[in-house]
Regions:
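A structural signal for short loop-to-beta-strand junctions that line the ligand-binding cleft
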Residues: 25-62, 96-99, 203-213, 286-293
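A local structural motif
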Residues: 68-73, 137-153, 166, 190-196
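Alpha-to-beta junction loops
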Residues: 1, 14-16, 164-172
């Protein structure tokens, strides 16, 4: 289940605590990059994540090349990202290039602010979001990105925005990788417009570690009513562990544990960017849930 579904099941006492199973199996929860800490309830863990989609920066290499600007690094502060987007922007009527693009989801804007590990959307006081909204409103005013109003009115999907070929950078989840690859392969996207692409690590606030990003997870649990709890946990452990992660990666999905084998599998997919920097962007250091428990 996703986190809201997990929360409901925990509150209804329908899930078995996995604490003893995890200890007995010798599972290293650090492999999950902090995700399990965020779904621990009163000191106990009732699920193990097996899938995790996290956010990255997608960029159009042709736009960068045309501007003579180096591709984004895997260690950008928010200030770096804003400055780079402004460098790439061309507001000339009829040949506009947007330095960046933000989809209309709240996640695309306000969750930059949770990457310092000090805040979440459950805080109650949201003053920490102000600098990020201010930055993006300023970008809208200066033509660096399309406005929320225009995007909402037009109903422009993020995939269409990127595939148009006039967006330099876009923040979006890892699920877009397989979409981009398959749509370019099928001819739905024009490869002359967006076929030369790469990914970079998510930009972060000053003081936050490079490779920090926001994530969503899907987890597996053992029901407290199960007559075969040990067998059920064996399955949970396999799917959420390194062997299950390899299988997930081989199908184009992102597992919750990102080992070197997993990264090599994803980076080895036909259509994935061949540059080393894009492969390195698959490494994350801290994952903060969009919706924590």
């Amino acid at each position: 289940k996703d986190v809201p579904g997990y929360a409901t099941l925990v509150q209804k006492n329908t899930l078995e605590s996995l604490d003893d199973y995890i200890t007995d199996a010798g599972i290293n929860l650090a492999d999950f990059n902090g995700i399990t800490d965020q779904v621990t309830v009163d000191g106990s863990l009732y699920e193990l994540p097996f899938r995790s989609d996290y956010w990255l920066i997608y960029y159009n290499k042709d736009v960068f090349d045309a501007a003579g600007i180096a591709y984004p690094s895997n260690d950008m502060t928010m200030e770096d990202y804003d400055a780079l987007a402004r460098q790439l922007t061309d507001t000339t009527y009829g040949s506009q290039v947007y330095g960046c693009h933000y989809h209309t989801w709240r996640s695309a804007v306000e969750l930059f602010g949770i990457l310092d590990g000090k805040h979440s959307i459950l805080d109650g006081n949201y003053d920490w979001m102000i600098p990020y909204y201010d930055m993006i409103l300023s970008e809208e005013d200066d033509g660096v990105c399309q406005t929320y109003t225009d995007l909402s009115t037009e109903g422009l999907h993020y995939s269409a925005a990127f595939s148009n070929g006039n967006v330099a950078m876009m923040n979006m989840g890892s699920w877009f990788i397989s979409t981009l690859i398959s749509n370019l392969d099928s001819g739905e996207y024009d490869s002359s417009l967006c076929g030369n692409w790469g990914i970079a690590s998510y930009p972060h606030p000053d003081g936050a570690e490079a490779g920090s990003t926001i994530a969503t997870i899907t987890g597996l649990a053992v029901t407290s009513a199960s007559a075969n709890k040990d067998a059920a946990f064996d399955f949970v452990n396999w799917v959420s562990g390194t062997e299950g992660a390899k299988v997930m990666a081989s199908t184009g999905n992102f597992p919750a544990i990102m080992t070197d084998d997993v990264i090599n599998t994803i980076a080895g997919m036909a259509g994935f960017p061949t540059d080393e920097s894009s492969k390195e962007a698959l490494n994350i250091t801290n994952a903060y849930l969009e919706v924590p428990y």
